Amino acid sequence: DSFLEANLMNFGIGLGVIPILGALLGLLHLQIVWWLFLLLALIMPIYDLFNYILKSGLIKSNFVKSNGDSNDVVNEINLKGIFNKIFGKIKFGELLKIKKSTIYVLLMLIMFICLFFVMNKGAFLNPWLENGDSWGHVGHIKYMELHKTYYTPGETQLTNYGIPYPPGYDILMTILFQISQSSYWALKFFNALLVSLATIFFYFFAKEFTNDKKIALFATLILTIIPSFLSHFIWSKTLAILLYFPALYCILRSEQNKKWLIPSIIIVASILITAPVTAFYLAPFLGILWLGKLIATKKLNLNIIYAALGGLVLSLLFWGDMFIRYTFKGVLIILNIVKVKGGTDATLTKLLHVHGTGATKYKFMDFIWVNTYNMINNPKGIGLVLSILVLFAVISFIYLFIYPFVSKYIQKYSKKDSKEDFKEDVK
């Protein structure tokens, strides 16, 4: 269980490192190429491996007398000892035993496989890309694949997803383009894979949050079957939303070990340079998490605040450069976060006038009922059954938590008032 969790979440954390690392390479005017990411990823494992071999005495130095007066040093590597050190402690019989906790992980992986099958099949049913969002991304990714950078000559914006639009999603896809024979296949396949990976990362976040594998598995099932969570539509929000779960997982782990703040900050920064709108959504998520923890533990839980502020500062590796190049107001205008009226006044549009999927306004039934057809980018609604479960959950929450609190509050002050009335009557 812990072995699977460690390796699967390492994969999620690694995904969260790529966008901000790519932004750093771009800022330093280094090429965004797959082998450089691989080299940087192997530095620490290779260092740890050699450090382990040296400390364990698996490399022995022998002094051999040469023909001259001096001695030559010959290093002998004990390959048999290395093999025994690595594999000697592994009890292969125990590996075949499946623990109860491992069954939950395997069930979650079945959900992942099913979701990936659906998303991958749907992505390749059409021989073309969906709409302008997909073509905008593929145009910018192709430019980055050829020129190894997200910077364009002057202030030219080749597509609507060129800078100052955050390049996190395109950085990841550029690396995958470079190692794939077909750009078309890479974009569709890996985008569907990103959507499906949310199942894995959400399960471990939910397990960490609830400290209950059964609740985590049920919550993962609900997320997997919700039609409106994510689709195979190609846009940067897919990666940004996916990274929420590794970020929240690391933030929760930082309560036990402060070292987890490092990946927390890195992943939060990557979210902030992947999709502008989704970056704004992150603040309420972290705020709700902080408030819930405050109520439950009566502690400030500063780790959540540190992760948010640290990620914001680290994201300035990209945003700071963009604000210098285009000015703060210019970036907001280009990203259509503000709208210019009369050439001078800028008023907030996207943040104050929130629309639903496909820029349409949601009606009440859009949240409950799921149509047999989708919008061009994402389905609507959570379904009738889940809506009933949500209603039941809200009623249960009010009955179990809100009602006792209010009742206790009323009784406390009603007794206080009755005592004061009694004293006045006595007087």
Locate the predicted segments by residue:
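Transmembrane alpha-helical segments of multipass membrane enzymes and assembly factors
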Residues: 1-5, 23, 201-216, 253-256
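Alpha-helical transmembrane segments at the extracellular/periplasmic loop-to-helix junctions
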Residues: 340-408
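Active-site lumenal/periplasmic loops and adjacent helix-entry segments of GT-C-fold
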Residues: 96-243
